[in-house]
Design a protein with these regions (language model features):
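Domain-edge interaction signal
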Residues: 1-139
Length: 139
């Protein structure tokens, strides 16, 4: 299993623990929370939280690896967080505390304010499909 998947599973677990509500297989919300977690990791540590790259899609940053996350034999977090450091968990939980209360569309709109996403969409119409990589250096 990739670290990106480990982070996504822990993020869902942390969301459910912190908010005391189900995540309900919200792919759009997962994508945006993962984006903000990656951004937060760069801000706090100078390093990525996970190795996967985001692409600049119409509805914001997307991890292609997670595109069908809930549809492909999704198995929830099982309590094994050995792939994640305490710093990783702190970053994820901080993002949940800061952004978890917002719905997917609010987070989508918030991600559209990010320069990294704007740069990945440069020259594209609002509805035009795009798949430019959002470089880790652009966060």
């Amino acid at each position: 299993m990739s670290k990106t998947i480990d982070v996504a599973k822990y993020l869902i677990y942390a969301y459910e623990q912190i908010s005391n509500s189900r995540f309900e297989m919200q792919e759009l919300k997962l994508q945006k929370l993962m984006y903000f977690a990656q951004r937060e990791s760069f801000a706090l540590t100078g390093e990525p939280l996970f190795p996967s790259d985001f692409e600049g899609w119409v509805h914001g940053p997307v991890l292609v690896e997670l595109r069908y996350f809930f549809e492909q034999d999704y198995v929830p977090y099982n309590g094994d967080s050995s792939a994640l450091s305490e710093t990783d968990k702190y970053i994820i939980e901080s993002v949940i505390n800061k952004y978890g209360q917002y719905d997917a569309w609010y987070l989508r709109n918030l991600s559209h304010e990010e320069m990294s996403w704007k740069n990945s969409r440069d020259g594209l119409d609002d509805s035009e499909v795009g798949n430019r990589i959002i470089s880790n250096r652009r966060y």
